[in-house]
Amino acid sequence: MNYGVVLPIWQLTAAEAESLAVRAEELGLDGVFVPDHILAKPATTQHYGGHWPDPFSLLAFLAGRTQRIRLGASVIVLPYRNALVAAKAAATVDQVSRGRFIFGVGVGWDEAEFVDLRLPFRERGRLSDDYIRAIKAAWASDVPEYQGSYVSFGGATFSPRPVQRPHPPIWVGGAPGAVSAPAVRRCAELGDAWHPLGLGLDDIEKGYATLRDLASRRGRRDALGLAPRNLLDLTEAPKGSGRAAFQGSVAEVAADIRRVRALGAAWMTFDLPREGVPAMIRAMERLAREVKTTAA
């Protein structure tokens, strides 16, 4: 099992993000992930904050400060950027990190942000599907060709391409708190792993079973991965029945990890507490030293 942490970049300076990534690597964790917004409309500032560094630029910076740890997006909102711009940025991060990039993708949720960016909110799913196909095509050859509903290109060189072949792993995220049928379908058709956000254990199991069934019916023979993302909330005393997944004592959280690992999950990604950098470091230390050991 690989363990990653999602940095709450809306409340971090670049130096703080660097210190957390370096500490995560020192502790033997496997991945550091960052989220994505371009504009912080009221719904975003209410839930998170207004400070949103560009995720690709931040990951490239962290690549120069780390050696081993994987660097990923959780998640890039695909409609926000031209497909070729996103493909170039992702390929560059994969190059400067020497093949450590994980390309988490989603369709977005804040309609007000789409309005200001002059993007069609109700077409974001279809647009994202087209963009994934276009990005894969851009990465597939030095002079790629693609004809899609929203983007078409050809007759030009695209370089650099990613280090990883055929491309960095594409993790498909979905709306938090419930199994997103469109995201499961998108992953079955176009993704490499399902990256559900904030689901309970039963929903993770049901959603992953649906994903594998859809992929099989579409003729896919490769194994689709599972990489849940949940809040890590470690308590000294057990929370007992009725607790949220991955929240409770070390033993309770470790039991949850063993359950998703038995389903086939190769990754578990955790949102860190938002009570400041020292609390985030303590959570990473407990994850690395206590939870990993207990779940092994």
Locate the predicted segments by residue:
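Active-site-adjacent structural elements that line small-molecule/cofactor binding pockets in enzymes
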Residues: 1-296
